[in-house]
Amino acid sequence: MVPQALLFVPLLVFPLCFGKFPIYTIPDKLGPWSPIDIHHLRCPNNLVVEDEGCTNLSGFSYMELKVGYISAIKVNGFTCTGVVTEAETYTNFVGYVTTTFKRKHFRPTPDACRAAYNWKMAGDPRYEESLHNPYPDYHWLRTVKTTKESLVIISPSVADLDPYDKSLHSRVFPSGNCSGITVSSTYCSTNHDYTIWMPENPRLETSCDIFTNSRGKRASKGSKTCGFVDERGLYKSLKGACKLKLCGVLGLRLMDGTWVAMQTSDETKWCPPDQLVNLHDFRSDEIEHLVVEELVKKREECLDALESIMTTKSVSLRRLSHLRKLVPGFGKAYTIFNKTLMEAEAHYKSVQTWNEIIPSKGCLRVGGRCHPHVNGVFFNGIILGPDGHVLIPEMQSSLLQQHMELLESSVIPLMHPLADPSTVFKDGDEAEDFVEVHLPDVHKQVSGVDLGLPNWGKYVLLSAGTLIALMLIIFLMTCCRRVNRPKSTERSLGETGRKVSVTSQSGKVISSWESYKSGGETRR
């Protein structure tokens, strides 16, 4: 089922709803005319089964669309993206640490995504912790890589469920739809290779809560079911119905576009793919209740007209118009030909627009062709006017002409990032603005000694370092020798000055050089 079919449901509903609430009814099959007496006239009961003699009514339960059912069934889901966050640190020779964060992707498994989603919904504190980047570790002259595998959950991500084939439709899916959710496969691929979509509830059937049980009266003839009177009192015929599954539930699509699930013994053909069903909303229920009241009122008007005919013993074309069948189905048609009251078996169909039965001037279309008139008289009070136009004495009340107003969803789903084609990631580093990480799985890898240089540079640096170290040792040894040498010389000279005595020329002993010097200066 193409996704566009759901978008055109509101457009298809209006003509189908006219089938349920016709502005007029006219025979599509008209039997031979036969004269009758005035006492054979009778008013049709549009609320009582007159379908092929099925007059046996019995109570039964059936399933119909829930009131408020809308064309697009919303399925809440979430997307799960596998993200690997890598923190790479390098500590150089002087202890300066540089940290680089990188992101990569991996395709997650559905089980892991389901567990991550449950973490988020349960408010597990580990979820808050997992939102942070991995804590980078570091070692001197080494490169340390710390990685964390995270499952990124973004919710809600709302998809539309097609009730006809249970396929899902959303712009986050590559082709706009997903038909792969089964018991064994519980996810859909998305526009992102490393992101999958999953429903919040693993049982997708629970999202299709569109049915309700109702009570009505089954109309049957022997073992054959002809139709039923619904919970609101309106008869619905099974003639022309076809089998149609909604959300996997087998039911019948009736000619008026409604859908019911009920037990029947008759063999029914499957509906063609283009057969859709009417929406069931509060407005349709309200109008259906008003239709029942209107049909009761019309029956009272018919009985009043019939009583007038019986009392006055006279029949007019205007009075015969009250005896027309007001809903699709089997009934009678009446007319007056050459002052003779005539009756014919008829099967009535609904009229959507007046152009269907009056396509041109003077033509009353019945059974696909212009019906002949007798001296300007057709049937059911329809005549040919003096100007050649077909005149229909009455039409259904304005109540039955109003258009059906469909309920619109009051829930506006949040736009998921993947629904915008511009957010389809081409590079791994574009995921930073997209992700919220979950379920950390931290791994640490410590490399060997790394100086941050190529291989030849490492050897040059080691050689230079060794040479500098040798030169430093030699320099220190040289400095130590120079510091020790002046101290030893001074100590030896001091000792000599104290012990050596000098004899002067006069024969006196001079104890030191200073005394000798002072003595010499005295002599001078």
Swiss-Prot record:
It is found in: Virion membrane. Primary surface antigen capable of inducing and reacting with virus-neutralizing antibodies. Almost all human and veterinary vaccines are based on the functional aspects of the G protein. The chain crosses the membrane at residues 460-480. Residues 487-509 are annotated as: Disordered. Gene3D superfamilies: 2.30.29.130. It is a single-pass type I membrane protein. InterPro entries: PH_Rhabdo_glycop (IPR055448), Rhabdo_glycop_CD (IPR055447), Rhabdo_glycop_FD (IPR001903). Residues 20-459 are virion surface. One of its GO terms (biological process) is entry receptor-mediated virion attachment to host cell. Residues 481-524 are intravirion. Residues 487-498 have a biased composition (Basic and acidic residues). Glycosylated and palmitoylated by host. Glycosylation is crucial for glycoprotein export at the cell surface. A lipid is attached at residue 480 (S-palmitoyl cysteine). Its main location: virion. Coiled coil: none annotated. The keyword Oxidoreductase does not apply. Disulfide bonds join 43-302, 54-226, 80-113, 178-188, 208-247, 242-271, 363-370. Glycans are attached at residues 56, 177, 338. Keywords: Disulfide bond, Glycoprotein, Lipoprotein, Membrane, Palmitate, Signal, Transmembrane, Transmembrane helix, Viral envelope protein, Virion. GO terms for cellular component: membrane; viral envelope; viral membrane; virion membrane. Residues 1-19 form the signal peptide. Its mutation dramatically attenuates the virus. Attaches the virus to host cellular receptor, inducing endocytosis of the virion by using different host proteins including TFRC, GRM2 and ITGB1. In the endosome, the acidic pH induces conformational changes in the glycoprotein trimer, which trigger fusion between virus and cell membrane. There is convincing in vitro evidence that the muscular form of the nicotinic acetylcholine receptor (nAChR), the neuronal cell adhesion molecule (NCAM), and the p75 neurotrophin receptor (p75NTR) bind glycoprotein and thereby facilitate rabies virus entry into cells. This is Glycoprotein. It comes from Rabies virus (isolate Human/Algeria/1991) (RABV).
